């Protein structure tokens, strides 16, 4: 009940992402500058949970999007970014992100080992 009440207020989901072993040589994380994608680039995807149905977004490519990646991230570095904000009046409510096959990665690069943690931030007003 408390969680459902909290979700009625404004909330944001903040993500922390980092390597857990060796520097990332293969499939690095890339994020899209939230100012560079258009609302029509978003594709709604339904997520089914045991007691509710939610939704997430996927992003269709558009030439105006600007993507940034972080090669060779070490376990001493972390990215912190907002992946969602429930306030629909804000620009930059989402930070689209994914990994990608970096063509400059060595052919024998080890698989990426990383961890992501998502936290919820709840606002009073």
Predicted segments, located by residue:
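Short amphipathic alpha-helical surface micro-motifs
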Residues: 1, 11-14, 40-41, 49-50, ...
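A contiguous catalytic/ligand-binding core that recognizes phosphate-bearing ligands
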Residues: 1-39
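N-terminal start-of-chain detector that recognizes signal peptides
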Residues: 2-4, 51-54, 88-91
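Double-stranded beta-helix
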Residues: 23-80, 86
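Catalytic core of Fe(II)/2-oxoglutarate
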Residues: 57-125
């Amino acid at each position: 009940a408390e969680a459902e009440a909290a979700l009625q207020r404004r909330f944001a989901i903040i993500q922390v992402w980092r390597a857990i072993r060796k520097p990332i040589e293969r499939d690095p994380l890339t994020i899209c500058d939230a100012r560079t994608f258009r609302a029509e680039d978003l594709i709604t995807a339904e997520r089914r949970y045991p007691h509710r149905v939610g939704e997430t977004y996927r992003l269709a490519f558009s030439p105006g999007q600007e993507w940034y990646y972080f090669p060779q991230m070490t376990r001493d570095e972390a990215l912190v970014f907002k992946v969602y904000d429930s306030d629909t009046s804000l620009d930059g409510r989402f930070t689209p992100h994914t990994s990608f096959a970096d063509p400059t990665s060595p052919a024998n690069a080890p698989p990426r080992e990383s961890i992501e943690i998502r936290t919820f931030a709840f606002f009073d007003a």
